[in-house]
């Protein structure tokens, strides 16, 4: 009988829990590759990490710790969230705490501590009953909290985050926090079809809260894309002056300067952010990519070798920090491979190329990798056969792309050189036949060979930029 009563209590409790607005009912990790990737992105990649979102972050951390089975740590984060809410939203503490209390209830439920879970369900119920609802209320503050949570959780949550902020603004259209959330969500969704012009939401958010420096930076980045660079730079300068230590502002400003080609200013800002967040692998990644861009710049201009070596060392140091902490960064291993090849450290270059090949790559990324590795084999390793193999494999992926065209040209030049020495070279003729088939060229192979011979046989020298 006691067992039946316990089961009935559990089922009743679970029914109540499903009605709560909580991280446990929002499906935040739906579609994620791994919990590690999710946690890394939430804690390190996402911006707006400043003080006003500490309670939001604590609730997300509590949810992650629960998913890992670290229940004591989860409860610890929920206690921190409560404290931040009391401190930052004293006049709305009850409503702002509903999500946290819901998370408490879920954690205790999974621990089998049903009485404590019921205690938090009842706390939610008491507040909601003031609004004539048993376990959830339609509160703009709750919609806002869900919106911020979803924004922190990555790109696949941006659309739902935008809906949350729109819903909150319907009830309170002049609320600065709700307007900021909508502006940020609109900015992020602008890169995906259907395009959503974020300029008006961004300007409205600034009108409602002129002190929101992060939103100013986002508006500046959008204006830069619209070729309104002067206004964009003015907004960034103003934001940096008023919030010189805000890491989200600094990172956004660095992005703007990097786009304009002012790599030194971008690096200076990112290093400043790194002082506040020394272990943030995304900052190391961005700094490393800036140094890599400077390497390409100096190399193109024929700069001093010592300067080039210094820049390569900086690029390697930061990119290695990022790669060692998160091996899934897009192209970072191949960047490292090319940089090591530049300084003659071929074993390290080979290691990072193979590391990149071992990943699950998109067709575009795989084609770029075949191009880079083919260049490495051709120019550094002097292994023509391997280079040809990788250029052929790369061209097969997408011959119409920029990379595909480069590899077709390289294969043709290699065939030209062979034919200039021996017009019957079998490897050269095989290459030309492959290219002829690739281009669906119906001309005879011999005629095609004559045309290729006339086009010259020069292969340019290799460099990191030679892609």
Give residue ranges: language-model regions.
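Conserved structural position within tetratricopeptide repeats
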Residues: 83, 126, 167-170, 204-207, ...
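Flexible helix-coil transition and linker loops at the boundaries of alpha-helical arrays
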Residues: 42-50, 84-95, 127-139, 204-208, ...
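Alpha-solenoid helical repeat scaffolds
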Residues: 36-43, 79, 86, 122, ...
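Structural signature of alpha-solenoid helical repeat junctions
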Residues: 53, 94-96, 136-143, 174, ...
């Amino acid at each position: 009988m006691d067992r039946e009563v316990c089961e009935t209590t559990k089922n009743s409790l679970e029914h109540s829990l499903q009605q709560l607005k909580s991280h446990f009912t929002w499906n935040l990790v739906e579609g994620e590759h791994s919990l590690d990737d999710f946690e890394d992105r939430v804690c390190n990649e996402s911006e707006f990490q400043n003080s006003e979102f500490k309670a939001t972050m604590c609730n997300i951390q509590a949810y992650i710790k629960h998913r890992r089975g670290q229940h004591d740590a989860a409860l610890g984060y929920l206690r921190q969230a409560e404290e931040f809410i009391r401190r930052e939203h004293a006049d709305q503490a009850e409503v702002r705490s509903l999500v946290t209390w819901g998370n408490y209830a879920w954690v205790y439920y999974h621990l089998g501590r049903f009485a404590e879970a019921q205690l938090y369900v009842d706390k939610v119920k008491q507040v909601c009953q003031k609004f004539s609802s048993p376990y959830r209320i339609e509160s703009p503050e709750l919609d806002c909290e869900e919106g911020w949570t979803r924004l922190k959780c990555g790109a696949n949550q941006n659309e739902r985050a935008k809906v949350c902020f729109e819903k909150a603004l319907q009830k309170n259209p002049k609320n600065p926090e709700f307007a900021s959330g909508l502006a940020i969500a609109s900015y992020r969704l602008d890169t995906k079809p259907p395009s959503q012009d974020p300029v008006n939401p961004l300007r409205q958010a600034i009108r409602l809260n002129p002190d929101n420096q992060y939103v100013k930076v986002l508006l500046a980045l959008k204006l830069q894309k619209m070729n309104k660079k002067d206004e964009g730079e003015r907004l960034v300068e103003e934001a940096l002056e008023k919030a010189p230590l805000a890491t989200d502002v600094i990172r956004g400003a660095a992005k703007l300067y990097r786009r304009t080609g002012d790599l030194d200013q971008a690096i200076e800002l990112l290093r400043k952010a790194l002082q506040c967040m020394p272990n943030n692998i995304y900052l190391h990644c961005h700094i490393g990519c800036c140094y890599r861009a400077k390497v390409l710049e100096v190399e193109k201009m024929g700069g001093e070798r010592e300067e080039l070596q210094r820049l390569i060392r900086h690029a390697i140091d930061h990119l290695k920090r990022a790669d060692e902490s998160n091996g899934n960064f897009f192209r970072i291993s191949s960047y490292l491979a090319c940089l090591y090849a530049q300084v003659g450290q071929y074993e390290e270059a080979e290691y990072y190329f193979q590391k990149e090949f071992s990943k699950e790559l998109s067709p575009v990324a795989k084609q770029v990798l075949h191009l880079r590795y083919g260049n490495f084999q051709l120019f550094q390793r002097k292994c023509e056969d391997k280079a040809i193999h990788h250029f052929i494999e790369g061209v097969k992926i997408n011959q119409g792309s920029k990379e595909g065209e480069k590899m077709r040209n390289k294969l043709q030049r290699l065939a030209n050189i062979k034919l200039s020495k021996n017009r019957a070279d079998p490897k050269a003729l095989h290459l030309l036949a492959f290219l002829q088939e690739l281009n669906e060229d119906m001309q005879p192979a011999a005629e095609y060979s004559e045309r290729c011979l006339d086009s010259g046989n020069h292969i340019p020298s290799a460099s990191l930029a030679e892609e």
